[in-house]
């Protein structure tokens, strides 16, 4: 028995986060409330005074009553607006109360739709609190600052008033002549002072899980109503209401100070915004995964964030914590209910230890990130936790041990149930259209450090056999606290990536099969490449092509040239390296290229020429294609337009029919 303040309990839970509450609810759901204080849960206080005291923050009786009554919290749609999120609702309620009392108070409001929490101000004297949404909150307490092409960005009102958010953190805004300062304070301790000067007078400070950073942009003369929104967790989008342009400005870390708080290094990272030049600012987040060396000490078990720290992305920490507690609590229940022998929880350590991130990994990846940053290559890391059934855990444990043994000489980033993907931006070669967005899926014993090194080189690089992917959980952090399979949070396998990197042309594609729809998107400078099932799905792609005026790659099942392509905007500049390739076979082996060999033969490429080429090629191979289709192939009738690099013309073979067995292995081919 555990003694605490003269009261006895069977299980004492320290920490009332997702893991702690999940553990308490699971224990209580099996009738462990027969005696008082069987399960107790404590959490640290949230006061700003810095107290280290703990309180019994959540009554287990309340949890038990909710479980017994079948009560549940409100259903939340992961795709809903932020108005449906608890943090916003609470903020609005506090704002209403303050307004009703007549207090002249500004509320620090944090956007919680993504991990990037953007500080917005709500003026409770504006009598708008009852109908506030994220944008009106921004407008009520902020003034807009002019930026490029009419896109507007909110600038904080600078005053000396102390603001306090409902989560117990405080901010101080100070006036200082025509410049400003914004100081973040947590638990009464100032952490960082960020300058808003005249030269870079527009600044937004965000807080990403205790990692403050700022975005900067030069002043311009345009003025158009806009709004601040967030997408992708770390991207701040600045978009106008009536414009098709979605501008994005991302943070770039300083290579000399990788682990410090985020900031934009003007000397190397801040550039003029020129949409025509297609310059990209990619985002990245240096972070260090950590894990406890031991998961158990006597009758004390570590679970959740107490035993492993993950990046604040994709819900991986939450899902892993829930899995920890579920693994542990059902074994504790066996002891509490008298149906199990003593100490069944010893298997908890063996079954959950493979989640740990090794220290060697941190050092290797930090070194690689520093190297990439020095080469103007920034990396954005996202992680998702793959679903592994309990029957597979023991089977994969041997592989994990082998990985651990190899880690000293070949550092590993992922363990057997982790998948990592990188989005990298390539800059610094002086070519306006240099851009690459490779995604690398890591499985089992793949080495991240090797992959990054190859990406940083200027040699040809193609993905190796990373293994077959399985379904994995949603990347949304506000998904339900559950390890169960949910159809709206998952999509099936057939994930394979084959990026090719070159110092002048970066051609990267991502292939994903979702149900019966396969969409392939790629970028070469401003070129948009789309591969789809039928002509109907081509239309939205053509809209993008019309606005980009870039290259085209279309595949379809139809026997006729799609009429929509007649309206497409075809590339008319720098086409000396472009040619048309058609495939009318079912096996993907019937690629036919134009007999023209001289560079520049397709400088007059347009819809008419491409259509004539397609029809000519199709007529010559129709009999073969139909025969192959009758055998279940169904892949004939395809046209590809692609660039050539150093005389090697690239296109990609993507079987379109569900019957094609090679759908899980799309590859680049050279012709």
From Swiss-Prot:
Q: What class of enzyme is it?
A: oxidoreductase
> Which source organism does the UniProt entry give?
Ralstonia pickettii
Which pathway is this protein engaged in?
A: Aromatic compound metabolism; phenol degradation
- Give the protein's recorded name: Phenol 2-monooxygenase
Q: Which InterPro entries match?
A: FAD-bd, FAD/NAD-bd_sf, RIFMO-like
Report whether Endoplasmic reticulum shows up as a keyword of the record.
no
Q: Name one GO cellular component term.
A: cytoplasm
Subcellular location field:
Cytoplasm
E.C. no:
1.14.13.7
What's a BP term from Gene Ontology annotated to this protein? phenol-containing compound catabolic process
């Amino acid at each position: 028995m555990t003694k605490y303040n003269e009261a006895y309990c069977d299980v004492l839970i320290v920490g009332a986060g997702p893991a702690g509450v999940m553990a308490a609810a699971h224990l209580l759901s099996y009738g462990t409330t027969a005696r008082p204080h069987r399960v107790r849960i404590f959490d640290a206080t949230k006061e700003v005074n810095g107290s280290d005291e703990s309180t019994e923050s959540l009554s287990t009786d309340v949890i038990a009553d909710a479980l017994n009554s079948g009560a549940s919290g409100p259903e939340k749609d992961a795709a809903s607006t932020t108005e449906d999120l608890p943090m916003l609702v609470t903020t609005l309620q506090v704002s209403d109360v303050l307004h009703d009392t007549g207090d002249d108070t500004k509320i620090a409001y944090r956007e919680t739709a993504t991990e990037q929490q953007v500080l917005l101000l709500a003026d409770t004297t504006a009598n708008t609190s009852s109908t506030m949404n994220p944008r009106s909150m921004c407008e009520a307490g902020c003034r807009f600052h002019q930026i490029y092409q009419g896109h507007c960005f909110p600038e904080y009102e600078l005053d000396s008033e102390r603001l306090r958010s409902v989560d117990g953190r405080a901010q101080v805004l100070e006036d200082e002549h025509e410049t400003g300062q914004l100081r973040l304070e947590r638990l009464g301790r100032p952490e960082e002072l960020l300058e808003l000067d005249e030269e870079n007078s527009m600044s937004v400070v965000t807080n990403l899980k205790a990692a403050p950073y700022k975005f900067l942009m030069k002043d311009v003369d345009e003025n158009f109503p806009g709004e601040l929104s967030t997408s992708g967790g770390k991207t701040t989008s600045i978009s106008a209401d009536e414009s098709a342009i979605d501008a994005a400005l991302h943070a770039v870390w300083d290579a000399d100070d990788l682990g410090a708080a985020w900031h934009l290094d003007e000397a190397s990272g801040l550039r003029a915004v020129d949409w025509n030049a297609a310059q990209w600012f990619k985002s990245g987040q240096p972070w260090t995964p950590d894990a406890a060396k031991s998961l158990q000490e006597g009758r004390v078990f570590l679970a959740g964030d107490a035993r492993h720290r993950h990046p604040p992305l994709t819900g991986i920490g939450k899902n892993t914590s829930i899995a920890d507690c579920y693994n542990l609590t059902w074994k504790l229940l066996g002891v509490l209910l008298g149906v199990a022998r003593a100490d069944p929880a010893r298997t908890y350590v063996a079954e959950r230890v493979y989640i740990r991130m090794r220290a060697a990994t941190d050092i290797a990846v930090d070194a690689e990130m520093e190297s990439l940053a020095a080469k103007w290559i920034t990396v954005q890391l996202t992680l998702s936790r793959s679903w592994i059934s309990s029957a597979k855990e023991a089977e994969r444990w041997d592989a994990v041990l082998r990985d651990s043994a190899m880690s000293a000489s070949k550092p590993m980033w992922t363990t057997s149930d982790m998948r990592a993907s990188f989005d990298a931006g390539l800059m610094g070669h002086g070519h306006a259209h240099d851009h690459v967005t490779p995604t690398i899926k890591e499985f089992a014993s793949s080495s991240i450090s090797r992959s990054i090194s190859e990406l940083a080189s200027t040699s040809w690089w193609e993905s190796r056999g990373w293994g077959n992917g399985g379904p994995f959980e949603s990347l949304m952090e506000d998904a339900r606290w559950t390890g169960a399979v949910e159809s709206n949070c998952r999509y099936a396998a057939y994930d394979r990536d084959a990026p090719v990197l070159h110092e002048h042309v970066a051609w990267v594609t991502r292939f994903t099969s979702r149900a019966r729809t396969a969409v392939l998107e790629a970028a070469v400078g401003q070129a948009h490449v789309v591969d789809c099932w039928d002509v109907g799905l081509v239309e939205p792609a053509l809209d993008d092509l019309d606005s980009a005026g870039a290259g085209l790659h279309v595949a379809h099942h139809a026997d006729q040239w799609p009429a929509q392509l007649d309206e497409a905007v075809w590339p008319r500049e720098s086409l000396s390296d472009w040619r048309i390739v058609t495939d009318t076979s079912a096996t993907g082996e019937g690629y036919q290229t134009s007999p023209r060999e001289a560079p520049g033969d397709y400088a007059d490429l347009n819809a008419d020429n491409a259509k004539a080429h397609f029809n000519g090629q199709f007529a010559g191979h129709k009999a073969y294609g139909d025969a192959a289709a009758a055998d279940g192939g169904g892949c004939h009738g395809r046209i590809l337009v692609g660039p050539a690099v150093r005389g090697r013309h690239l296109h990609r073979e993507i079987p379109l029919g569900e019957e094609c067995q090679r759908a899980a292995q799309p590859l680049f081919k050279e012709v």
